[in-house]
Amino acid sequence: MNPEHSPLGKATVYAAQYDASLLFPIPRAGAREQLGIAAALPFFGTDIWNAYELSWLNARGKPQLAVATFYVPAESPNIVESKSFKLYLGSFAQSKFDSVDAVRDVLKRDVSAACGASVSVQLVSPHDFGKLQMEELDGLSLDRLDLDTDVYEPDPSLLSAAADEAPVEETLVSDLLRSNCPVTGQPDWGSVQIHYVGPQIDHAGLLRYIISFRNHTGFHEQCVERIFLDILQACKPLKLAVYARYTRRGGLDINPFRTNYNQSMPDNARTARQ
């Protein structure tokens, strides 16, 4: 399915009852082919979706609510278009379910089917909201650099690394990531964390490269995969992990993570802007 056929940018009709058919899958293959990715992925990882506007009725008609988190594996053949995800979650509002577990099971079944892979689902009930974390991405901030730039389309030539020096291990972060929805043109604001082991990456060039996404159109997942591949090819790190946390839209935030080495899942802690 093409993004142009999704609910994005079209008049919205809210479903009166639960409707799994609202989910609109988009194949990852098209964007990956443009990046030169063949069948064998050069990374693995997860897309972490947080949903803050999930509510349903219990068996007696009383509204219930939860914050939902979906863990979509990067190897899944599809992503779900975000507005369709919002409409799908909204369709639960006037539908009755016997328990929280029943809601979780339905969410897992439907989203897994749309993505074409097993998706993990967690629901946090109101009595546990106090346990939800908020913290900034850990690492050395690139935004401290005072520099000039005029490149606002992705340009990997901005990237360089000191290949003739000893390898280093660094974690670098920036809050200056911005890209744009390929269907509506709406800006997507995010923060990005880059951890690597290898030749030291030029910090100013990396920040200019991150800023260069400012006028780029692409879904969150596609932007992170492009960042990962450009750094991998231009700087040749031995190990690389890229994690972005995008601000919320329509009650959803999307947080893609890509890596080429075994490590634990990054913390799903909201940043201040989320």
From Swiss-Prot:
Please give the Gene3D superfamilies that the UniProt record associates with this protein. Answer: 3.30.1130.10
Give the EC number(s) under which this enzyme is classified.
1.7.1.13
GO terms assigned for molecular function: preQ1 synthase activity
* Residues the record lists as binding NADPH: 82-83, 249-250
Q: Which residues form a coiled coil?
A: none
Which Pfam families does the UniProt record give?
Answer: QueF (PF14489), QueF_N (PF14819)
Recorded catalytic reaction(s): these are:
7-aminomethyl-7-carbaguanine + 2 NADP(+) = 7-cyano-7-deazaguanine + 2 NADPH + 3 H(+)
Q: Name one GO cellular component term.
A: cytoplasm
Its function, per the record, reads: Catalyzes the NADPH-dependent reduction of 7-cyano-7-deazaguanine (preQ0) to 7-aminomethyl-7-deazaguanine (preQ1).
Similarity comment: Belongs to the GTP cyclohydrolase I family. QueF type 2 subfamily.
Q: Which NCBIfam families match?
A: QueF
> What is the protein name stated in its UniProt record?
NADPH-dependent 7-cyano-7-deazaguanine reductase
**Source organism of this protein record:** Burkholderia vietnamiensis (strain G4 / LMG 22486)
